[in-house]
Swiss-Prot record:
Protein name: NADH-ubiquinone oxidoreductase chain 5
Organism name: Rattus norvegicus (Rat)
Pfam family, one: NADH5_C
InterPro entries found in the cross-reference section: NADH_DH_su5_C, NADHpl_OxRdtase_5_subgr, ND/Mrp_TM, NU5C-like, Proton_antipo_N
Keyword Membrane: yes
Gene: Mt-nd5
Taxonomy of the source species: Eukaryota, Metazoa, Chordata, Craniata, Vertebrata
Amino acid sequence: MNMMTSSILMILILLTTPIIISMTNLPKLIDFPSYATSSIKFSFLLSLLPLLLFFHHNTEYMITNWHWLTINSIKLTMSFKIDYFSILFLSVALFVTWSIMQFSSWYMHSDPHINRFIKYLMMFLITMLILTSANNLFQLFIGWEGVGIMSFLLIGWWYGRADANTAALQAILYNRVGDIGFILAMTWFCLNMNSWELQQIFLTNTNNLVPLTGLLIAATGKSAQFGLHPWLPSAMEGPTPVSALLHSSTMVVAGIFLMIRFHPLTSNNSTIMTAMLCLGAITTLFTAICALTQNDIKKIVAFSTSSQLGLMMVTLGINQPYLAFLHICTHAFFKAMLFMCSGSIIHSLNDEQDIRKMGNMMKAMPFTSSCLIIGSLALTGMPFLTGFYSKDLIIEAINTCNTNAWALMITLIATSMTAVYSMRIIYFVTMTKPRYSPLITINENNPNLINPIKRLALGSILAGFLISLNIPPTNIQILTMPWHLKMTALLITILGFAIALELNNLTLNLSMSKPTKLSSFSTSLGYYPPIMHRIIPQKTLNSSYKLSLNLLDLIWLEKTIPKSTSITQTQLSKMMSNQKGLIKLYFLSFLITISLIFILHTLNPEWFQ
C-alpha cells in the first residue's frame, strides 16, 4: 500500500471515528465538539501529504477497496478516484469545515443537543467527500443523496419553528426534481454503456443529449440555478454554521462539481454547453438583482452565493472546467468567513439580522468588521485577494470567448452588481451611525470565535495565490489582450463600488418614497415564490378538487350506485309492463270488464256452467 492510499484511508478513519463514538455514551464524558474539531484539524494536516504528493508526481490514483456485487456484467465496487479535483477539494473542504466546527462550539454552546449537531455536520462533510472522490455513479449517487438528507436535517434543526420546517421541506422537494435528472442519466448510462464506472463512460464518450440533460437538471436542483433556486435563500432558516458549510464547500457546489466531473462529455456537445451558459447567465443576473434590495444580512450573502454559482455555470458553459473548480475552491474561503462574521454580529446583537438596525460595527466589533470587509472585497474580485485569482481569469475567458454575446454581457453586468451589494453590506453594517440598542453588550474575545475567522481571513488573502500556482498545465493558448479587456474585472468592480456608495449616500437621509416596479421586482424575488408556492399550487388544488368532485361525488357516488339502481329499475319496469299509473282508467277497464261478464251471464247462463 503506497503513501497516497494509506493517507486517504487514514483521513477516512479519522473522520468516521467521532460518528462511531457519538453512538456510545462517551460524548457525555468528553468535550465532543472539541474532539470533533481536533479530528478534522488532524485530517486536514494529513490531507496535505497526498496533496503535495499529487502536485509532485502529477499522477492520478484509483483506490479500490471492496467489491460489492456483480449484476450481469455491471460490477459495483467501492473505489475512490484521486485526481486534481478530488484531492484539492479534500484539503479545502477540511480546512473550511475545521473553522466552521470550531465556530459552532461557540455559536451553539447553549443548544442542549450540540453533540448531535456536530455529528450531523461531520456526516454532511463525509457525504460530500464521498461525492467528490467517487469513481462510479452509484457511489456518487450515495454521496449526492447523503448531502441532500443531511441538509434537510440541518436546515430544519430548530424544528419548533414553522419557517425552519418549511425551508427544510422546500430544500428537499426542489432537490427531488434534480434527483429525477440524475436517475435518468444513471439509467441511460446503465442501459447504453453497461457500466457506471467513470473511466468506461468517458472512454465510450457518446455524444448523446439525454444523459447530459439529466445531469444538467440534477446540477440545476442541487446548485440552485434559475428555476429551482428558491430553496437557497430559504435555507437561511438553519443555524449560521449550517449556512456557512452549506454555501462554502458542500451541497450547493455539488451540482457544479458534477458537471465538472463530466466535462469530457459536455465539452463535445455544443447544445449542452449553450444551455449551461444561458442558465448560468440568467441565474447570476437574477440573483444579483434580488440581492440588491434584501435587508436580511444572511439572505444577501445567500443570494451572493447563488450569483457565484451562476458564474461557475457560465464558466462551464465556455468550456473552462478548471477555472470553475478554481472558483469553487477560492469561493469556499471567503463565503464561509462572510457567514461566520454575519453570525458573530447577529449573535452579538441579540439575533438581529436586519442590516438597517446595525451600523458602526467597526467601533464595537473591529475584528469581525475587518474580516467582513476582507470577505466582501474578496467576493468582488479585488486585486490580490483570493477571489481575484479566479474571477479575473473567468472574466478574461468571457471576454475572449466567441459565443453568445448576450449571455456574456449580462454576466458582466451581474459581476458589477456583486460590488454593489457587497458595498451595501459594508456601508450599512460597519459604517454610519449605530442603529441598535445601546443596552446590548458586545464581546468578541472568545478564541472559538476569533481563531476560525482569523484562519479563513488568511485563506481569503492567500489561498487564491497558492491554488492558482498549482493549476495543471492545460492546452489553452497564452493570449495577449488589450489593456481595456485585461482591466475589465477591476473596472466593473470599481464602477459597482462607486454606484453603491453614491446610492447609499443619496438614500441614507431620504424619506420613504413609493417603491418602483423594479424595486418591487427585486424585493419580492422576481415574484417567483408567490407564483410557484401560492398561485400554481392553488390552481392545481382547485382543479384537483373539481376533478375529484366530478369523478367521486357526481359520477361514482351518485350515478354508480343510487341513480344507476333507480334508472335500471325504471327501465326494467318499462320493459316488463305498460302500466302508466292511470287509476281512473284502470277502474273503468275493470268496470267495463265486469259489466260485460254480468250481461253475458244474464243473456247466456249456459256459457258459465
